[in-house]
Design a protein with these regions (language model features):
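C-terminal/domain-terminus segments
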Residues: 83-123, 128-134
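A generic alpha-helix propensity feature with a strong bias for hydrophobic helices
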Residues: 58-64, 113, 122, 131, ...
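S-adenosyl-L-methionine-dependent methyltransferase catalytic module, highlighting the catalytic core
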Residues: 126, 136-145
Length: 146
């Protein structure tokens, strides 16, 4: 039987809607003033491994596969997660980000970014000089955030 030493930290003034699921075997750190929509999943692990030579055998039922973490999840301060967002193992979301409804975050979202889609892609960044959310050039081919 595997042993885990999970570390879960939720900052002050977090606002969570209904059906928010936070699962942790390694580490989940959530900053202050999170606004979290309905049906959000934040997890630092998966049932099995799906890359490389140690990938899980599909003949083994998912519930019997070992829990595997690709790394802790870190969510900064003043972040808004829209309804249905999934934040997966190893994801880092910087301060002041907005993650659009049903986005899947698998990598790093820089501070002050609006990201949408699956996988999450940056579409706007906050400009302190202009005090506005500016489109990212070539947003139609928005960079994949990894």
């Amino acid at each position: 039987m595997a042993r885990f030493s999970p570390s879960l930290r939720i900052g002050s003034s977090a606002r969570l809607s209904d059906n928010v699921h936070i699962a942790c075997i390694k580490g989940v750190s959530i900053g202050n003033h999170l606004l979290c929509g309905s049906g959000v999943l934040i997890t630092d692990h998966a049932h099995g491994s799906y890359r490389g030579v140690s990938a899980s055998d599909p003949a083994v039922p998912p519930a019997q596969r070992p829990l595997v973490s690709a790394g802790p999840v870190v969510i900064g301060n003043n972040v808004w997660l829209g309804d249905g967002v999934a934040v997966l193992a190893g994801a880092v979301i910087g301060d002041g980000c907005v993650i659009g409804a049903h986005a899947v975050v698998t990598g790093t979202i820089p501070p002050g970014t609006i990201a949408v889609g699956s996988p999450a892609r940056a579409i706007r960044r906050w400009s302190p000089e202009e005090r506005a959310w500016l489109p990212i050039p070539d947003a139609n081919a928005a960079e994949r955030l990894s």
